[in-house]
């Protein structure tokens, strides 16, 4: 057992504890959180008054799916590949995982890029381990789809095949969903349709077991994603949602979570010209559930807390900024029973910070525990 004491504990499940303790059990779970915990048999870690929080949760990235020569997150042979699974390409020795641990990020939702109209499934994994099967928190988490520039550029412009236009992107997605709906109905009615790997992969989406994970920057693309999700009665997250602040009232009526980012960086294409750190605050004020994302490696994953802090500096309340990188993404991913807060019974993913990383330049992880194991200590 490990007892972290003399800490300012932000549990994300209630009031902060100004002189708090976190007890980590031998089973890798949180055994207790409070102001006066005693465990004579435990190893003592004196936090020295430092901030202690749950491990940060990244809701959208491509960590572990890269290669020095050819990235493993975009399968450019076909614009429709729902039968691909991120877990089959995740490389636990990718240095981005080490960066995440050093940055206090303990769980990531990682998966296919945005080249394809439908790219395959994302998985939620811990950032510490050597075998991906043992790092998985949930698989699948969501089905990636993409709107706008990227599919057009990858296939229409470069590949000389559909989609050339936004019309074709919507058509290809609708066609897949229509065929998947028919396939589902046949299976549910006891018929035995010919096996189709793509349609089989879409069944969890059609049954609302997992959401579409919709890459959309421009306001019209965001609303096209909403229109299609409503047509088929699907769950969905709005990933990037770069111009979401321009249509906040419309999005509030729909209620889909917004996963905002990557905002730290340049405006490399026209879809990003209205990119601003104002977006999370505007969407939160309108009533949306907001997560902050890095889209790593677009932004280094260790900058996730910094991005939340910058959003807080532009109108997102500080407590909501913390929620946007802890409990909110955990809830959106369907893993809040394990991560996102410091509560007894949850995974012991705990970070001791040198200073509050949302308010202090240079605030970084001093110690990072994942599943109760010390994964990082500054200076070691």
Regions found by a protein language model. Name each.
Residues 4-11, 18, 331, 343-380:
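C-terminal cap of metal-dependent C-N hydrolases
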Residues 103-223, 227-236:
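Polyanionic/metal-chelating signatures
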Residues 68, 75-77, 81-82, 211, ...:
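His/Asp/Glu-enriched, well-ordered alpha-helical/loop segment
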Residues 3, 42-46, 142, 368:
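Conserved beta-strand scaffold positions in the cores of enzyme catalytic domains, especially
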């Amino acid at each position: 057992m490990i007892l972290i004491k003399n800490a300012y504990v932000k549990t994300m499940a209630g009031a902060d504890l100004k002189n708090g303790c976190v007890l980590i059990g031998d089973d890798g779970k949180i055994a207790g959180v409070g102001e006066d915990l005693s465990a004579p048999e435990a190893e003592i870690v004196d936090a020295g008054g430092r901030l202690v929080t749950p491990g940060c949760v990244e809701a959208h990235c491509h960590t572990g799916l890269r290669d020095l020569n050819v990235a493993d997150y975009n399968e450019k042979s076909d614009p429709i590949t729902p039968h691909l699974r991120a877990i089959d390409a995740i490389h636990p020795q990718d240095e981005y995982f080490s960066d995440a641990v050093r940055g206090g990020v303990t769980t990531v939702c990682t998966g296919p890029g945005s080249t394809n109209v439908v790219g395959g499934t994302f998985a939620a994994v811990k950032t510490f381990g050597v075998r991906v099967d043992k790092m998985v928190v949930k698989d699948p988490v969501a089905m990636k789809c993409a709107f706008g520039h990227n599919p057009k550029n990858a296939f229409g412009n470069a590949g000389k095949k559909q989609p050339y236009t936004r019309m074709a992107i919507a058509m290809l997605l609708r066609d897949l969903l229509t065929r998947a709906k028919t396939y589902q109905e046949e299976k549910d009615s006891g018929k035995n349709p010919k096996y189709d790997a793509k349609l089989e992969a879409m069944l969890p989406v059609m049954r609302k077991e997992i959401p579409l994970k919709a890459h959309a920057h421009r306001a019209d693309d965001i609303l096209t994603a909403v229109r299609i999700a409503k047509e088929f009665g699907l769950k969905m997250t709005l990933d990037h949602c770069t111009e979401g602040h321009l249509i906040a009232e419309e999005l509030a009526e729909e209620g889909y979570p917004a996963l905002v980012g990557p905002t730290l960086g340049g405006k490399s294409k026209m879809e990003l010209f209205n990119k601003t750190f104002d977006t999370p605050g505007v969407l939160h004020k309108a009533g949306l559930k907001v997560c902050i994302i890095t889209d790593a490696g677009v932004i280094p994953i260790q900058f996730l807390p910094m991005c939340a802090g910058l959003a807080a500096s532009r109108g997102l309340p500080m407590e909501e900024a913390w929620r946007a990188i802890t409990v909110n993404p955990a809830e959106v991913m369907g893993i809040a029973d394990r991560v996102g807060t410091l509560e007894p019974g949850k995974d012991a993913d705990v970070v001791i910070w040198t200073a509050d990383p949302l308010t202090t330049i240079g605030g970084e992880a001093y110690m990072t525990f994942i599943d109760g194991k010390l994964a990082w200590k500054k200076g070691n």
